[in-house]
Amino acid sequence: MVKRLLSLALVLCAALGLSACKPEENDKAASNNSGTEIRLLSGSENKSIEPILQEAARQAGATLKVTYKGSVDIMLELEKGKSSEYDAVMPADRMWITLGDKTRAVKNIASIYRSPVVFGVKRSVAEKLGWTKNEVKVADILKAAQDGKLRFMMTSATQSNSGAAAYFGFLYAFAGNPEVLSESDLDKPQVGDKVKTILGSVNRTAGSSGWLKDLFLDRYDYFDAMVNYESMIIETNQALVQQGREPLYAVYPVDGLAIADAPLGLVAKGDPAKDAAFAKIQDYLLSAPVQNQLLNQGRRTGLGVNASGANQTVFNPALGIDINKVLTPITMPAPEVIEKALTLYQTAFRKPSLTVFVLDFSGSMAGSAEEELKNAMRVMLDQSLAKRYMLQASPKDVFIVVPFDSQTRWVKKVEGNDQNKLMELWQAVAREKANNGTDIYSPVIAALPEIRKYNYENYSTSVILMTDGKSEGSFDNLKQSLAAQALTGMPVYSIMFGAADPSQLNAIAVFTTGKVFNGSKDLISAFREAKGYN
């Protein structure tokens, strides 16, 4: 009953196949070993422990090549079974293996470490709320957010394992903590109402736990807390202490705690050399010295979730990380309940999204690039395609599309999730033809009056800007327009393609707390990933 919780994440990405769970493709080759190569598909949560993974491969006489992707993409890759290009997999949670590995190709699965999903709250805020002395329930968190006493960040439940884990914790708490969550629990009006309220209180969302941590550090003064892995809160606090800033106090909701189990499994293809190398790598990671090393990096190890004996400069009780307290995680429900819960999150419970797609149809986009762009937008708008990646629209979502070249061509929008209206919008995009030059700034400015027609705080609002060339126009004009419309906190997520200038897009990302995605290899995947951030 205890550990099925983590499986949850798996479902999430599975349905989604999307960005949040999406690939941050950072392939890294290992040492100088000339032995068997193991290709590992891993969640981005493991980036900080890659040196340990590489040492495990070295000790096994193997070469390790790691590719980092999101939970959904890991799940989708595992659907390929033995046809996958990877030899091993290490997602954030076993759930992703359960949901994706339909042919049971993944063998010898073992948890390498565990990390609870917690609320990291600035200590002074936690003290004012009475959370440093008393147990905290999900209802307490909801009340603090409703009262305007807690501005917090959280990843999407259909894009990121940490967001999914927190979401299931909310569901359990508001359903009265059943032994196992059921479909009938999801149908209870009071459950839906309370979940909608707490998700509507999220002040900023993202598609990646690691990126959420980085954003919190970058915009520290704007937020009071974030939902993330305990290990990420520990890493955040280490950075905050170095910066001379107030650290976060870890809050473990007593009625809605989820724990991720970081499983490592072999994609069994009948290759004796790879099987043997994998076994040595896994044995090394599970050895006592290495488990202690992981513990000292903020990961709970051992058969349970007990971190007794941990370094208290890492597991700091003064910051709420109580290594002696027994943690009681929720039990993951049946797969069909997980799937229904994630669908409800996307289509009914989450904070509505307002997404502006700013699309480059300059002359250099002619040919295959133009077709890729149109195909990507079909995935965004056609609900029959969006469903596979858990990107379905909700009845309150808003879509605004702005095609451009050297000037803005038009601005059109659709409110809600009516399939016919969304397909009409896609058909308008499909009729566009590439021509003329490139100005990425003026079309974003042209969309701002439409955005301001809506209550900004009631939506997860963002711009997704796709371009393939160096822009004319003025970045200063864009900055001034964002300031004039009080939209400087609205993220612009750029998708870089072709000859786009990274310096121009990075400048926009820094100014708006956005991010740049590389669409050169797979434009559809880049759009999926960017959409997963709102």
Predicted regions and their residues:
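Acidic, polar low-complexity linker/tail segments
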Residues: 23-26, 303-356, 363-371
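N-terminal segment of the mature folded domain
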Residues: 24-159
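Periplasmic-binding protein-like
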Residues: 111-119, 192-199, 206, 243-270, ...
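Ligand-binding pocket segment of bilobal, Venus flytrap-like solute-binding proteins
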Residues: 178-252
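C-terminal motif of bacterial Sec signal peptides marking the signal peptidase cleavage site
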Residues: 17-20
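VWA/integrin I-like adhesion module and closely mimicked acidic/polar interface patches used
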Residues: 245, 467-518, 528-530
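Von Willebrand factor
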Residues: 350-415, 420-466, 494-504, 525-526
